[in-house]
Amino acid sequence: LVKKERMITLNTQSPLLNKEAKTKLNRWPSWIGYAAIVWSALYGALHLYWLFGGGGYPFKNDGIGAALVSLLPAKVSSIVFVTVCLIGIGVGLVMRKPTYEAFSRWFAIAYSWGFSLTLLLLIPDTKLIAAMAYAFLLKFDFSWQIFNQIICIVGALLWMMTAVVYQRKTRYACEYCGRNNDEEPFFLVRWGRLLTVIAALSPVPYAIVRFAWALDIPLGIDPQLLRDFSSVNPMAHITEMVFGSLCIGGGLLTLGLIQKWGEVFPAWFPFIGGKRVPVMLAVIPASIVAIAVTAAGLTFTFNFITEALHLMPVDNLFISQDWGIAGPMIFWGPWGVALGLAAISYYYRRRGRCSSCGKG
């Protein structure tokens, strides 16, 4: 009986059975590391160009919503990026041949995750989430600064997935799904409901303030400033209403990560009613919003703390005197983190059988 079970296990993981999976374009574990190396080389070369006086340097400290990396002088920032990208090329090459020595393994993992989190949290600023929000008003502001932020987010995702593949390899798990002989579910699955509720409720304070302004209620803001803003911008009331509605609508959609209608389209949906919701249809938008919101929230939280502790000059108009402008954005950090983790939990809960190892 034991021999038969072993034979069955070998057959389900045989190359013949998984031929279809290996011929598809989903062989990302085989090329993701090379993509991260190429990205590091190109972006490092770009910063080398800026280091020697090239034009187009994207990190500008232009106010309270500026990225945290803009606090560094341009020369210092470019030197740091050139150095880190060069190290990344070396680490990436080493990770192509996994080592099982504890120090080497953990250094590669720490570098990959550290670099990716730096690119995600310190590079994007409030321009990214603002551009996404104003797109719903048919206002498109796509500058070089925003494009550079997208480049850095792509690099962060490449290094993040490279780290995931490397960790899976070095613990003898499937590179595609991360499963091994341990059948324990991913730990975030147990926290999925709580994370989703936090992510759904976090934008509510911001929405309340925006709805109040749309109704000419000076909640958390000087009444004269609200009147002046409305007189200068004829679209102010519509803008506030749209921004508040986006937060409430986003919160309701977030609840779909733990609701039945987040797995199967409701029957009243035309054409697709009753069909299963593709996993990535929920994961990808949630992840994009999570990245933008977390970066913006970190920027505002940092400015709020530095102003409160008098560590550096910050425009008091936006933080001290009129808390309604920046106060609700303190919740953006927890909102983004909770939304990102909730999306990961949703993915691991709903993913099916792995086409590579056959487990699931």
What are the language-model segments listed below?
Residues 8-30, 102-106, 169-194, 267-275, ...:
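Membrane-interfacial, low-structure loops and terminal tails that flank and connect transmembrane helices
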Residues 22-154, 166, 343-350:
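An N-terminus-focused feature that recognizes amino-terminal "leader" regions
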Residues 36-47, 111-122, 198-210, 282-299:
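Hydrophobic alpha-helical membrane-insertion segments
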Residues 45-61, 123-135, 208-223, 260-261, ...:
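Membrane-helix interface motif
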Residues 61-68, 134-141, 224-232, 308-324:
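Short, membrane-exposed interhelical loops at transmembrane-helix boundaries
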Residues 64-83, 226-251:
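Transmembrane alpha-helix entry/boundary detector in multi-pass membrane proteins
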Residues 72, 139-154, 189-190, 318-333:
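Individual transmembrane alpha-helices with interfacial aromatic-anchor signatures
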Residues 86-97, 161-172, 250-264:
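Membrane-water interface of transmembrane alpha-helices
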